[in-house]
């Protein structure tokens, strides 16, 4: 789409004794004294926020003592337009104190602006890759271009003691009949009815196959399969090493 994306997640703890509502998040080049690069309004924040523990909220509110995770997918027209470093100004309002609330709740301001979330972007040139499929009728979606949380960007889980966007760069490829705009020919409860079924997959670049799992049973379309251990969460898959620490997983 001609856009360069910077993808990350902001973790914001409300340690105040009053519920908070994020009204804007400014991205600021360099440090807090730099130029404002972009502003996310309250509606955009709400569409991309979930609470720690994996619950999408649909709001920009952070209850007392809870941590919100704001998924950021910032698009830029060129590599040169991306700041080498940037931070954020989170602007939030607090709900009115309640009579039975903590003693210091009434002393908090009604609105605050907090600087945080410092980011250093990579200086590496992004790896150019090819398509993992061939032929016509392929539709790529649920990726970085989504304006709101999707089936991948809301997969925020703890890995190795850190909150991780486990499917941050995932893309869904769906094969459709352009004339009918459908993805199946037959019973949609059967895998073999899907136009993408049994189509060949291609390496997206010169690579080494470093992992193959093919022993798990197929799942029923549009249903979440039973997972006994975390290692089964991905299902059957292939991992390619593209070099330079870059992996591709199918």
Question: Predicted segment positions?
Answer:
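Asparagine-centered strand-capping/turn motif at beta-strand->loop junctions
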Residues: 11-19, 29
